[in-house]
């Protein structure tokens, strides 16, 4: 049972008892920093906040068929934690689990606050601390203050340092242009960032707009699911074969 005194003693709950560090984002960047903080400053009080309902960042948000890394995992992964699989590229689910294990080793799971959106952080010059507003019960896609929206609460956190590892785009909603005449389209328009878990592709005609990294991984996966796929692109991409097994990394692991 927690009391009001317990809450006051909680690190970050007051200017008199601030955190040493608040990390925003529980993806690769945030967990990488958590590891180094845990190694270099074991006595620090720190927390990790993420607006999503699980860690992983990009690898939690994106769940479309075929999602994988674009770079080899020997260079994309953590330098302190070798990629445990033999594959050159990492699948989305494997990368997310890889991040989770790194977070566990760093002690970040015990300091992780999910569904906690950092609404703002302001430097208090008099106190030499950051005053951070963390909103729970809502996400970055919602508007209004906690008092204006039912179920949302605010927690003020005080910290000596703030590190933003949240990336540069919104995880709540991807870029979605409106196409002329789309109101007359009888089919379904889907953004890979909000891929439905129950989507049936077998026997469907699918048009993939664009030929970037997402399209290159999505198209063959849709073909394997039985869809008839057409790629609509402005400029053709250069595509070449890539070994599925990383023989160099496997050699160094011996």
Residue spans of the language-model regions?
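Glycine-rich active-site loop/strand segments that organize a redox cofactor
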Residues: 54-98, 236-254
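Conserved N-terminal glycine/acidic-rich loop preference
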Residues: 2-32, 51-83, 102
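General small-molecule cofactor/ligand-binding pocket signal
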Residues: 47, 111-115, 190-191
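Rossmann-like dinucleotide-binding core of oxidoreductases
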Residues: 13-18, 22-23, 28, 32-33, ...
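Feature captures the FAD/FMN-dependent oxidoreductase FAD-binding
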Residues: 86-169
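FAD-dinucleotide binding site
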Residues: 18, 40-47, 54-56, 61-62, ...
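A generic local structural motif
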Residues: 7-10, 135-137, 149-151, 175-177, ...
């Amino acid at each position: 049972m927690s009391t009001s005194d317990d809450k006051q003693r909680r690190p970050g709950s007051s200017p008199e008892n601030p955190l040493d560090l608040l990390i925003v984002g529980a993806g690769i960047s945030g967990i990488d920093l958590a590891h180094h903080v845990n190694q270099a400053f074991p006595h620090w009080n720190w927390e990790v906040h993420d607006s999503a309902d699980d860690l992983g960042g990009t690898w939690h948000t994106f769940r479309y068929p075929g999602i994988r890394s674009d770079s080899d995992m020997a260079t994309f992964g953590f330098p302190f934690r070798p990629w445990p699989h033999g594959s050159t590229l990492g699948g989305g689910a494997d990368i997310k689990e890889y991040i989770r294990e790194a977070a566990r080793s760093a002690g970040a799971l015990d300091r992780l606050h999910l569904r906690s959106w950092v609404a703002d952080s302001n430097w208090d010059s008099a106190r030499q601390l950051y005053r951070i507003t963390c909103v729970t019960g809502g996400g970055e896609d919602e508007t209004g203050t906690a008092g204006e929206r039912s179920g949302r609460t605010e927690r003020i956190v005080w910290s000596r340092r703030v590190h933003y590892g949240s990336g540069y785009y919104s995880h709540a909603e991807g870029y979605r242009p409106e196409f002329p005449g789309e109101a007359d389209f009888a089919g379904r328009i889907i953004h890979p960032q909000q891929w439905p878990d129950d989507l049936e592709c077998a026997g469907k005609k699918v048009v993939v707009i664009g030929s970037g990294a997402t399209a290159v991984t999505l198209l063959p996966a849709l073909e394997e699911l039985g869809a008839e796929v057409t790629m609509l692109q402005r400029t053709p991409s250069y595509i070449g074969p890539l070994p599925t097994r990383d023989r160099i990394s496997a050699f160094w692991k011996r």
